């Protein structure tokens, strides 16, 4: 069976099974994305005005957070130079005003929870319960129609669509600076499309958890059979203690209720927070991450040389990646889903073709989102079937076949199963925002639907 045939078969199988899922809890980060498509002349002018030498300093090493315009522009350059995504908290009010005046090209649903809620609930039709730190009218308006709910406790637990929530709280805006592959600024050229995110938000970056989610969490959790947890990445050494304590308690509740929980990584600047997140892995069933996130976790596990090997090539060297994933799975999870440009991998303690098929479905969802900008209905994924499989992933597959005896995307590594898929590549994507969340949530829920 060819890869194209496997893609088509996986799509049909998931289409028939995804309706079985009774409910997914999503916590914790939801916000509004203000997307700006970068223009060379505009960015270079701003760099000159801010002081080029100071800006370039931050293009070499990211600050922990943003308090000056130079740090903002330097962080954008950091992402452009490497073609890598990054996200930092913008603390300073003047920098926030600067970003607001710089403006945006479009407003969209943002935050990992918000993006996944619209995909799982609005497109796939799976009931979801979403944690929304601040339910403003603008935030609520960005949720799609469908079985998307937030909990209220006026007369016992009641689930309502965010647009039916009584009240109007604050807007949490994240400014996203997108650039295409080949984007040129100063003497830098972006090796691939990506973005830098500046979070002008006093809630999500410190992992604000709503009172009802702290006091009545078990009641909310009982309405779900799966959970996806994200949003820990913006915490710092100063802010992590109380939120991590609450998250740990929530994960224990989910584990006691036998709810399979997926923890989605994102770029985490603070080393102490990375260490704390690593300490949560024994409480979750599954983890999702990309090459930058894997390397950053391996660094705190004293595996710096391995981390460097993972980042040395594009696409990431699969032998180094699998070596890194094997170290990470020893922290106690059942499943690790790795996604990078060109291919996805899953290392699992259990076996079955459904793991590979879930990766294929998620790659189809990612290609469709890249091609269309947004997925509006499940049938849109048929268009993704026409996107060609990337040369890079097929080349990596030859290495994986040789090194790990993989056939039809499935093999063994030690006591674990390895599933591999080369991904479909959209040469000129409309947007990269939310593609990682699309990949991880689609793979997790579709794998569960195929196995149940």
Swiss-Prot record:
Pathway: Carbohydrate degradation; glycolysis. The active site is at residue 437. ADP binds at residues 290, 339-340, 426, 436. GO terms for cellular component: cytoplasm. GO terms for molecular function: ADP-specific glucokinase activity; glucokinase activity; magnesium ion binding. Disulfide bonds: none annotated. Its cofactor is Mg(2+). Mg(2+) binds at residues 264, 293, 437. Residues 1-452 form the ADPK domain. It catalyses: D-glucose + ADP = D-glucose 6-phosphate + AMP + H(+); D-glucosamine + ADP = D-glucosamine 6-phosphate + AMP + H(+). SUPFAM superfamilies: Ribokinase-like (SSF53613). Its EC number is 2.7.1.-, 2.7.1.147. Catalyzes the ADP-dependent phosphorylation of D-glucose to D-glucose 6-phosphate and glucosamine to glucosamine 6-phosphate. This is ADP-dependent glucose/glucosamine kinase. It comes from Pyrococcus abyssi (strain GE5 / Orsay). The lineage of its organism: Archaea, Methanobacteriati, Methanobacteriota, Thermococci, Thermococcales.
């Amino acid at each position: 069976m060819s890869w194209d045939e496997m893609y088509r078969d996986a799509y049909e199988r998931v289409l028939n099974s995804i309706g079985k899922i009774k409910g997914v809890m999503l916590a914790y980060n939801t916000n509004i994305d203000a997307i700006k498509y970068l223009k060379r002349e505009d960015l270079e002018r701003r760099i000159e005005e801010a002081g080029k030498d100071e800006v370039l300093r931050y293009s070499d090493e990211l600050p922990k957070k943003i308090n000056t315009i130079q740090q903002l522009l330097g962080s954008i350059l950091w992402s452009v130079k490497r073609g890598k995504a990054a996200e930092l908290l913008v603390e300073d009010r003047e920098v926030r005003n600067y970003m607001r005046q710089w403006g945006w090209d479009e407003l969209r649903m943002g935050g990992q929870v918000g993006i996944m809620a619209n995909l799982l609930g609005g497109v796939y039709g799976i009931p979801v319960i979403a944690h929304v730190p601040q339910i403003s009218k603008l935030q609520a308006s960005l949720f799609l129609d469908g079985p998307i709910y937030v909990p209220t406790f006026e007369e016992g637990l009641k689930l309502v669509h965010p647009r039916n929530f009584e009240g109007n709280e604050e807007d949490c805006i994240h400014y996203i600076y997108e650039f295409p592959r080949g984007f040129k600024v100063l003497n830098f050229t972006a090796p691939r499309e990506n973005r830098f995110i500046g979070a002008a938000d006093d809630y999500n970056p410190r992992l604000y958890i709503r009172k009802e989610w702290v006091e009545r969490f078990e009641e909310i959790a009982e309405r779900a059979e799966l959970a996806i947890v994200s949003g820990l990445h913006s915490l710092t050494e100063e802010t992590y203690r109380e939120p991590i304590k609450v998250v740990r308690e929530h994960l224990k509740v989910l584990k006691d209720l036998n709810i399979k929980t997926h923890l989605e990584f994102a770029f985490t600047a603070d080393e102490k927070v990375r260490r704390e997140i690593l300490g949560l892995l024994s409480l979750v069933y599954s983890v999702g991450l990309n090459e930058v996130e894997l390397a950053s976790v391996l660094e705190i596990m004293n595996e710096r040389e391995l981390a460097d090997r993972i980042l040395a090539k594009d696409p990431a060297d699969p032998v180094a990646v699998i070596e890194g994933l094997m170290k990470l799975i020893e922290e106690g999870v059942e499943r690790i889903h790795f996604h990078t440009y060109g291919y996805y991998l899953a290392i699992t303690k259990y076996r079955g073709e459904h793991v590979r098929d879930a990766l294929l479905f998620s790659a189809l969802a990612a290609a469709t989102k890249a091609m269309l900008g947004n997925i509006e209905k499940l049938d849109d994924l048929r268009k993704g079937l026409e996107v060609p499989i990337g040369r890079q992933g097929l080349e990596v597959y030859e290495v994986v076949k040789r090194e790990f005896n993989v056939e039809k995307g499935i093999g063994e590594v030690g006591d674990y199963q390895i599933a591999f898929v080369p991904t479909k590549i959209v040469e000129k994507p409309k947007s990269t925002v939310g593609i990682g969340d699309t990949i991880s949530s689609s793979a997790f829920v579709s794998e569960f639907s195929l196995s149940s």
